[in-house]
Amino acid sequence: MAEKQTLIDAINDRFNSQIEAVVAGVDMVTIELLPTHLLEVCTTLRDDPPFNFELLLDVCGVDYLEYGMSPWRTEETPNTGFSRGFEEVIQEQIIPWNKPRFAVVYHLLSLRHNHRIRLKTYVEGDPPLVPSVIKIWSSADWYEREAFDLYGIVFEGHPDLRRLLTDYGFVGHPFRKDFPLIGEVELRYDAAQQRCVYEPVSIQPRVLVPKVIRVDSRYEKGEKENG
């Protein structure tokens, strides 16, 4: 706990005017900052002796669309198929959200000090834009490509910002909250044409009710006797 507070004090002293907030979580410290200060703060966190966060562990995107409005919205499924395990959210529990829809999260590790830290920056625009940190940590290469592919977040300055997990002809970004669960189109190989072709999605949306198996003690004795 003392080490965490020491790190927080060092962050506040060094980045007083460059960060929006410092949150002391259970697992690690989180810094919230604007994209305009991202590169400067990241460079300092990597190079300055009190920090020495020389290792970038992960970069990921977050979509806060409808955050705090509903715990589960899948075409009214909670009111039908999942009603037995679903509780309605009362109006007082709705969380107001006044920040941008998308955020980029960075996880850093200091091998010298054995510290972990999380950076979070909220990004705006269509598409959402944020500077690439690949010149600070080369390991950001594929992490940023993944976030671009799945969320449509553009990392300015990335030398090779291509899709990573979906095919290059894919339309949309599948981890966005408004992307259809069944997708837009499906891809298959056509042997006659000897190439891959796109077709309308053949999956039909439907409500799936989980099978519930209950053990009824009234019949256990009879089953044992028959067995």
Curated annotation (Swiss-Prot):
It is an enzyme of class 7 (translocase). InterPro entries: NADH_DH_suC, NADH_quin_OxRdtase_su_C/D-like, NADH_UbQ_OxRdtase_30kDa_su, NADH_UbQ_OxRdtase_CS. It catalyses: a quinone + NADH + 5 H(+)(in) = a quinol + NAD(+) + 4 H(+)(out). Keywords: Cell inner membrane, Cell membrane, Membrane, NAD, Quinone, Translocase, Transport, Ubiquinone. GO terms for molecular function: NADH dehydrogenase (ubiquinone) activity; NADH:ubiquinone reductase (non-electrogenic) activity; quinone binding. Signal peptide: none annotated. Its EC number is 7.1.1.-. It comes from the Bacteria. GO terms for cellular component: plasma membrane. Its main location: membrane. It is a peripheral membrane protein. It is found in: Cell inner membrane. HAMAP family: NDH1_NuoC (MF_01357). NDH-1 shuttles electrons from NADH, via FMN and iron-sulfur (Fe-S) centers, to quinones in the respiratory chain. The immediate electron acceptor for the enzyme in this species is believed to be ubiquinone. Couples the redox reaction to proton translocation (for every two electrons transferred, four hydrogen ions are translocated across the cytoplasmic membrane), and thus conserves the redox energy in a proton gradient. NDH-1 is composed of 14 different subunits. Subunits NuoB, C, D, E, F, and G constitute the peripheral sector of the complex. Belongs to the complex I 30 kDa subunit family. This is NADH-quinone oxidoreductase subunit C. It comes from Coxiella burnetii (strain RSA 331 / Henzerling II). The gene is nuoC.
